[in-house]
């Protein structure tokens, strides 16, 4: 598992987000934004991703499929399932935006039609990537 520590957006994204994103944001340890990748040995390039945001009173998780292209260091992903909880009570849990169908077609989609990260730094305890839209994300390994 990896904890998100810093994010930026493209100039266009920053203009939309305004003061919230600015030129980039450090994510303090108080806010837990974690991403976990799971793969099976039989399908090493296809797997699952869980993106988890935890605040003192609420939790949000997005789950979906991933496809890793090792020669290009690209990880394509599609979040298809959402869970929202407040004070331990699940408010919503289910597929989003036709998620079941998108999961069936995920492996067949071209990279240009998917969201992805292109990793430019991969270390034992630190990873960094640019998103399809040009934003930057930095993660540290969960201890």
Locate predicted features.
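Soluble ligand-binding/transfer domains with enclosed cavities or grooves
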Residues: 1-143
């Amino acid at each position: 598992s990896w904890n998100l520590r810093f994010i930026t957006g493209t100039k266009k994204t920053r203009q939309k987000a305004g003061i919230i994103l600015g030129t980039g944001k450090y994510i303090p340890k108080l806010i837990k934004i974690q991403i976990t990748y799971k793969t099976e040995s039989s399908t090493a390039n296809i797997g699952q991703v869980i993106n988890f945001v935890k605040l003192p009173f609420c939790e949000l998780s997005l789950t979906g499929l991933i496809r890793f292209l090792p020669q290009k260091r690209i990880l394509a992903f599609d979040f298809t399932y959402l869970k929202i909880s407040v004070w331990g009570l699940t408010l919503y849990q289910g597929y989003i935006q036709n998620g079941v169908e998108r999961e069936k077609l995920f492996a067949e989609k071209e990279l240009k039609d998917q969201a992805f990260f292109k990793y430019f730094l991969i270390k034992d305890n630190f990873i960094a990537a640019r998103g399809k839209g040009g934003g930057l994300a930095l993660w540290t390994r969960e201890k």
